[in-house]
Amino acid sequence: MEIFQGNNQLKEGGFVATIGMFDGVHLGHQFLIEDLRKVASSEGLRSAVITFGDHPQRVLRPGGDLRMIMTLEERLRIIGELGVDTVIVMDFTPELAALESREFMKLLMQDYGVRTLVMGFNHRFGCNKDEYFEDYVTHGEELGLKVVRAREYQGEYSPV
């Protein structure tokens, strides 16, 4: 598994990617990564998990008492064991936090070579987080980025 760290542009592209913290790499995360790998395989592209070295809440709400379940190294190890080709560890900065979802999607395409974005069934991103899956699909169509919704993982009592 290749690991890229920092907010640097990648010269090589062609990824099917998903994005999230993946703290704990729980069954829902594992299910999402399974979908990611299937989509990447069907499209003949490499799979990529985009995550953050530190939790975005530390930038959004500095001074809060936020505890992580796993270290970055533990998350990377488990994600690698799940068969992901590449992990991109972004730095979550105030500038990144200020991006609207469409601009963030454009950045993923231009700077990281993402061609398809696999979204968790209830995942939202962008500075306002006021958009829904259909909005991301519309942005993707405008930008030339395919957006796919992963299947919902049903835990014993509720979706995960």
PLM regions: where:
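Nucleotidyltransferase catalytic core that binds NTPs
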Residues: 1-160
